[in-house]
Amino acid sequence: LKKGYMNGAHAIIKGKSKKEILFSSYVCHPSMANNELSGPILLNAVLKYLKDNFKHTHYTYRFILMPETIGSIAYLSKYHKYLKKNVFAAFNLSCVGDGKNYSMIESRSANTIADKALKCQIIKKKKYNIYSFLNRGSDERQYCSPGIDLPMSTFCRSKFGEFREYHTSLDNLKLVNEKNLKDSLNIIKNIIQSFDLGIYPTTKVKC
């Protein structure tokens, strides 16, 4: 990459462990509610949930908000070595504000702990969709690309490109509502709790 600048943001909540859980969303589609606003809203809500409810977390949490595709490429150009070493689960948040089926796009291997954690949550729902990495189309492409290969799966309600309002003026505030966003937040809350609260001390005393 050439020297230059790009507007973006990241936030880190340091935990007891350097091992990280990463959440990513994007800002680059003007005026679209589900395809654009819902992901960053959920990202912010997850950050607030952690700050308000955990005095100390076991894992470190990283939140990334960049323009889609080129933003994640730029971010990875700077941090990929550190992320490869420390991230053990990652989630891309996209199109999470409508009331359609809960959906996920698997990582390239389809067998990471992120895949298993997200799949465990959405299969509890009456209607859900699980897409292969072959159906990728958001920042999971970059984070899971060969040479990077982070353990990332994407969480959606309607998958991008598969709802009729996608990339039209109909993707507006009539399509999303607070209840749908809260329902999506609950999925992520449950994942966080399974990771951060599902840790138990073990004794090392012999005999």
Regions found by a protein language model. Give the residues of each.
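Proline/glycine-enriched tight loop/beta-turn segments at coil->beta junctions
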Residues: 15-20
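Acidic/histidine-rich catalytic neighborhood of metal-dependent amide-processing enzymes
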Residues: 5-10, 21-22, 27-115, 125-144
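Active-site-adjacent substrate-binding region
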Residues: 104-207
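Short beta-strand element of the conserved SAM-dependent methyltransferase core
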Residues: 9-13, 155
